[in-house]
Amino acid sequence: ASFYSNPKAVRIFNAYVKHLIGRENTINGKSYIDDPVIMSWQLANEPRGMNNVSAYKNWLTETAALIKSLDPNHLVSIGSEGNTSTPLPNGLDFFNDHDLKDIDYCTFHLWVQNWSWFDPLNAKKTYPKAIKEAKRYIRKHNKQAVKLNKPLVLEEFGISRDLNDH
C-alpha cells in the first residue's frame, strides 16, 4: 500500500488515467469520453489501504475526482471487494470508502471458497455455510449501499465445481 503515498507512483498512475480517458475508440472512432460503449471507469481491481489507510483514502478521493473532471459523462466506481472476511488488516471500510461524491455506485466481490466458507472437496458439508455466509455478506453490503443511496454491484463471484477439477 506504499503506492498511495508515493508521489512518483501516483503521478505516473494519473498520467496513465489521463492517457486512457483521452483515447479514441479505434473501432468506432469516438473518444472514450463520448463513447456509450463505456459504462464506467473503475479506480482499480480490489484496491486496499493495508497499513496506509489515510493515504489510500486520499487516493480514492483524488483519483475519483480526477476521473470525473476528465469524463463527467461516465460513472465512476472503486472496484472494491467490500469488507472481506479476511482476518488480515486490509485497510478497507466499505461505507466510508464509497461515501465520496465522485463515486457513483458501490462494488463488492464474493469469493466463498477463497474465504474458507466453501470446500469443493467437502461440498455437502460446507455448501450450507457458504450460502448462509454469502447471503449475510450480500445483505450487509446492500444495507450500507442503501444508507449511501447508491446502487450496489456484485462484480465478481467465484466458487469451484466438479470437486475442484476445472
Regions found by a protein language model. Give the residues of each.
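Aromatic/acidic polysaccharide-binding cleft in carbohydrate-active enzymes
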Residues: L121-N122, L154, G158-D165
